[in-house]
Swiss-Prot record:
Catalyzes the oxidation of 5,10-methylenetetrahydrofolate to 5,10-methenyltetrahydrofolate and then the hydrolysis of 5,10-methenyltetrahydrofolate to 10-formyltetrahydrofolate. GO terms for cellular component: cytosol. It comes from Rhizobium johnstonii (strain DSM 114642 / LMG 32736 / 3841). The keyword Lipid biosynthesis does not apply. Its EC number is 1.5.1.5, 3.5.4.9. GO terms for molecular function: methenyltetrahydrofolate cyclohydrolase activity; methylenetetrahydrofolate dehydrogenase (NADP+) activity. Belongs to the tetrahydrofolate dehydrogenase/cyclohydrolase family. This is Bifunctional protein FolD. Signal peptide: none annotated. One of its GO terms (biological process) is purine nucleotide biosynthetic process. PROSITE patterns: THF_DHG_CYH_2 (PS00767).
Length: 299
């Protein structure tokens, strides 16, 4: 019987831990966890996403601050805001919503956030800490951190002897996911668009993670029977059966057919997606604990 991971349920349990840790930190040291979100411009999707982050932060008991700047904001003004947030001791996490409007240089802004406040885990310092196995002081990018919660809950903390294949080598997901699996003692292969015999490589995986943005690319005959399959893809495809011009969301994995082979699988939607905001909250409360000299919670 295949287990379909309910991402909303797992995310809710992460949020519960965040709430408890936030309250305990405030009680023990008087520190209220603080998250600042910066959004530039008026992209509706970005505003919706930022709104949900702000609501979740308040629900967790955080001090939640949103800075909304016009689309024509100058680079130096945005940099000055980030510098002020870096210097603000009541803010433990800073998130700049991407993409930024042109011609703003998003990379320069992201790298200017103090690594200990970089709750998106995108700074080169945090990437370097992950690459060297320093999970004690680094912050991990939210989506791979969330996918890793699924892996740990399925296989435990130690992945010794298990083969993991990550399809996708992006800095945002593929590389950090591979590092997390490696840190947990898995034997890791990173596959990508230039990989030969991709299906054959995937068939060797006890843990298969797909993150390439190719709708339903991973078929049943790519998957080792009994494998754990984590689908990070979010693709919108035509769904004429539901009406003219209608679309539906699918992952990088052909869910129905792969479900018949895998032992554990994440759906799209409702799998990895809900974990991203949950892990943003987790990173923020971890950052607050470190600043206060307290041991952060484990997720």
């Amino acid at each position: 019987m295949t287990t379909v991971i309910d991402g909303k349920n797992v995310a809710a349990s992460v949020i519960q831990t965040v709430k408890s840790a936030t309250a305990a930190l405030e009680k023990s040291s008087g520190v209220t966890t603080g998250l600042a979100v910066v959004i530039v411009g008026d992209d509706p999707a970005s505003h919706a996403y930022v709104g949900s982050k702000g609501r979740m932060a308040k629900e967790c008991g955080f001090k939640s601050v949103q800075h909304t700047l016009p689309a024509d904001t100058k680079q130096e003004d945005l940099a000055a805001l980030v510098a002020a947030l870096n210097a603000d001791p009541s803010i433990h996490g800073i998130l700049v919503q991407l993409p930024l409007p042109k011609p703003l240089d998003s990379e320069a802004i992201i790298q200017s956030i103090l690594p200990e406040k970089d709750v998106d885990g995108l700074s080169v310092v945090n990437a370097g800490k992950l690459a060297t196995g320093d999970l004690k002081t680094g912050l991990v990018s939210c989506t791979p951190a969330g996918a890793m919660v699924f892996v740990r809950r399925t296989h435990g903390e130690d992945l010794s002897g298990l083969n993991a294949v990550v399809i996708g080598r992006s800095n945002l997901f593929g590389k950090p996911m591979a590092q997390l699996l490696l840190n947990a003692n898995a034997t890791v292969t990173i596959a990508h668009s230039r990989t030969k015999n991709l299906a054959e490589v995937c068939r060797n995986a006890d843990i298969l993670v797909a993150a390439v943005g190719r709708p339903e690319m991973v078929r049943a005959d790519w998957v080792k029977p009994g494998a754990t399959v984590i689908d990070v893809g979010i693709n919108r495809v035509a769904a004429p059966e539901t009406g003219e011009g209608k679309t539906r969301l699918v992952g990088d994995v052909a869910f129905e057919e792969v479900s018949a082979v895998a032992s554990t699988i994440t759906p799209v939607p409702g799998g990895v997606g809900p974990m991203t905001i949950a892990m943003l909250m987790a990173n923020t409360v971890i950052a607050a604990h470190r600043t206060a000299g307290q041991t952060p919670p484990q997720f």
